[in-house]
Amino acid sequence: MNLGDGLKLETELLDGKTKLILSPYEHKSKISVKMGNKAKIAKCPLRTKTGHILKSTQDTCIGSEKLLQKKTVGSETSQAKGEKNGMTFSSTKDLCKQCIDKDCLHIQKEISPATPNMQKTRNTVNTSLVGKQKPHKKHITAENMKSNLVCLTQEQLQQILMTVNQGNRSLSLTENGKEAKSQYSLHLNSISNQPKDENIMGLFKKTEMVSSVPAENKSVLNEHQETSKQCEQKIAIENEWKPADIFSTLGERERDRSLLEAKKAQWRKELDEQVALKKKEKEVSEKWNDPWKKSESDKIIWEKHQILDQSRETVLLEHAFSAVKQELQRKWIEELNKQIEDDRQRKIEEKIIYSKGEEHDRWAMHFDSLKSYPGSQSQLSSRSTHKQPEYFCVSPDTQELADVSSVCTPTTGSQVEPSEEEHIAKPIKDVVMANSKKTNFLRSMTALLDPAQIEERDRRRQKQLEHQKAITAQVEEKCRKKQLEEEQRKKEEQEEELRLAQEREEMQKQYEEDILKQKQKEEIMTLKTNELFQTMQRAQELAQRLKQEQRIRELAQKGHDTSRLIKNLGVDTIQIEYNASNISNSRHDSDEVSGKMNTYMNSTTSPKKDTGVQTDDLNIGIFTNAESHCGSLMERDITNCSSPEISAELIGQFSTKKNKQELTQDKGASLEKENNRCNDQCNQFTRIDKQTKHMKKYPKRPDWNINKPPKRYIPASEKYPKQLQKQREEKEVRRQMELLHLVEKNNPGHLSQNRGISPEIFHSSHQETESKFRWHLVKKEEEPLNIHSFSKERSPSSPVPAVKNRTQQTQNTLHLPLKNSSYERENLISGGNQTELSSGISESSHFIPYVRTNEIYYLDPDAPLSGPSTQDPQYQNSQDCGQERQLFDSDCVRDPLLNPNMVKNRDRQQAILKGLSELRQGLLQKQKELESSLLPLAENQEENFGSSF
């Protein structure tokens, strides 16, 4: 709590001049005052503390009054400096008159509307002085911020002097200046309840004030008491008159004087109690902190004397320490003189600076805010930063208002010239110059912005610029990233397009290569098919010529004229010989073609290798089988001939060739089984050869599931145990032989038709048949039954020339693309049945299937031959044929299809015939489709078999 709190001042016009008087005051409790001070300090922490330096005008006064004035003003000045108010008091003429009359002590505040330079100078003086005295943080009280003016009553002044005396007394116990300073600061803190940033130099000044007049101390206190009473009475009278100035409303709620006096008395009493209590607490703390200074009894006695008679103790202690006080006073005076000299130098420099057209720079800066004026801007900044409180002096005589103020030294009473104070603004100028380099922009032509607002606007503008720069940088970064991504995407697209183009080119090349390979395959297959067809055609022509020769011989034996036939045959024999040579040549050519095909198939890669499909080498013996197929067809056509001699010779040739094949197969059978089929053996050996060649050529093992070593196909019949398999094979052979004998027995004219056949030829043909059956051990049982029964039933049918030729052609074309097993079956049928029957069977005994045709042949079964027969077996044969024809005729008479006279229901017969004709047309269409589709199927089969190499 500050000692000056609770007092407010008012201004009144007395005798045409402005005076300061105490205003009525409403008492507040100590706690509320303390809390109010704290709240006010918290609310206004940034306001600068400025002090007012009032001009002192000395008048003629009595010596005693001048001494009283010195003491009063000096004590007040020291207290003001100690509390950092920075107030300098001076007495005027009215103050001197009131002191003479012992009326009241007034403190005049004369504020002149001086230039801002003078205001700034005063601010700087106070700041520099306080800063030199103690470099601690400034303490700003709420009352100083509110009024910056203090008026002390006589009682308050007495309390201050007592406190100073107590501080001097405690100082006597110490031995050096440092302990004295600490004791003063501790006492002052305990009394005023303020923080430790109290001005110690102010205490020294108080000590100097009191020590200068030790003898007049008591008289001064008495005078103070009397003047305080008279001042209270005078203020009570003056408060009844309310002037009509601008400060007339201050303290309006505190007009009641009686309440104010009571509250003041109570406040003084509480303050005394508080001072005594704080003093006791201070002594107790000193006792515990430094017990060697005093004894306990001395402390108790010292406290009692302090409470009873403080003034007497103060006088005694001041005599003891007058030497120390004088030394401190001398140091203080030297320091103060030094400060005054510095202020004088600063003032001279400031005059030079401010004389350079201040107003011109100010208005130039006002109207052109884009230019920076260092001097004027620093002045503006200092003026705006250090504003004076808005207290105006309302005086009719403006000439009396002083433009300059002076610093009063209380001890010496010397006055300082007004020019000395202007030097203090120099450091402020230096500080402000650092902040004057920014370009300030004003709102309008007539309004000057506050520097804080200008800095705020600059800071916002800088932040906005930085934000815009950051946004621009982000946008540029995004654009750059987007551009890089676009370039990367375009690059990837170009690479993808190049890759796709390369893939398309590769696919196109592969497609062209595949087409070329396919064309080559088709050409080779077409060439092979043509060769085979030509070979078959030549064999057929050769068989036809041989048949004609046999017929000529038969006719010649019967006595017919055969010159015409021989003539035609003579032309054809050359062709026959040529065709025979062509047959041998075609065989060699077919061998060469097959070799070429094999090499081509081995050289070309199979698509199945790429797909990883496991395939067996099933097409190894295709071309050799095709060659054997040609031979089998030739054999079939030759054995179908009616001449027993030629057929026997050809059969002998083919049988010897097949026996050679059997020998080679028997050599290979030592590795496998003896009774396997010939084709399986051939295929097996060719596969083994291919495997060995492949392994020699490619020693490295291929990858998984690609071109695996082929496995031989083992039928289910070969998976039996060896003993059981052998028994099954024997049963199969036995059954085949029994079926063959049954077929022979069922032919009634078989045994009687042995004319001119040597037993060797028949035996050889029979051996050939048995060898064929031995090669076909794993055939089904039902096939030979059906085939032989069918051939047995239809064998005696009469031949029709056109139908015979057509059926032979269709059979030849149909049997071309089939597998080797089908040809072996046909060889079995033709070789088994017809070789035995061909010894004595005539031309009418050929098997001709029944086919409905548009051609009608009226064949008389009883019509005689062109010449009489010369051999008895022939007559027997004709008799047997006649019996068969009679039986057939009797069947035809009974059959309604063959004998239309037997049919009674004609409509039903017509419907049946119509359905049969439709069925025949459908079958013919199906036959044509099969003929047209079998040739491509054969080519596809050849291609599939060839692709596995």
From Swiss-Prot:
A single cellular component GO annotation: spindle
Region annotated Disordered, chain positions: 691-714, 789-809
Alphabetized GO MF terms: microtubule binding; protein homodimerization activity
Region annotated Mediates localization to cilia, centrosomes and spindle microtubules and the interaction with PCM1, CEP290, CEP104 and CSPP1, chain positions: 570-949
Keyword Disulfide bond annotated: yes
Alphabetically ordered keywords of this record: Cell cycle, Cell division, Cell projection, Cilium, Cilium biogenesis/degradation, Coiled coil, Cytoplasm, Cytoskeleton, Disulfide bond, Microtubule, Phosphoprotein
Location in the cell: Cytoplasm, Cytoskeleton, Microtubule organizing center, Centrosome; Cytoplasm, Cytoskeleton, Microtubule organizing center, Centrosome, Centriolar satellite; Cell projection, Cilium; Cytoplasm, Cytoskeleton, Cilium basal body
Keyword Transit peptide belongs to the record: no
Coiled-coil regions, chain positions: 474-558
InterPro entries: CCD66 (IPR039183), CCDC66_dom (IPR040467)
Modified residues (Phosphoserine): S369, S606
Pfam families: CCDC66 (PF15236)
Highest taxon of source: Eukaryota
Function: Microtubule-binding protein required for ciliogenesis. May function in ciliogenesis by mediating the transport of proteins like BBS4 to the cilium, but also through the organization of the centriolar satellites. Required for the assembly of signaling-competent cilia with proper structure and length. Mediates this function in part by regulating transition zone assembly and basal body recruitment of the IFT-B complex. Cooperates with the ciliopathy proteins CSPP1 and CEP104 during cilium length regulation. Plays two important roles during cell division.
Subunit note: Homodimer; disulfide-linked. Interacts with CEP290. Interacts with PCM1. Interacts with ARMC9, TOGARAM1, CSPP1 and CEP104. Interacts with CDK5RAP2, CEP152, CEP192, TBG1 and PRC1.
Protein's UniProt name: Coiled-coil domain-containing protein 66
Organism: Pongo abelii
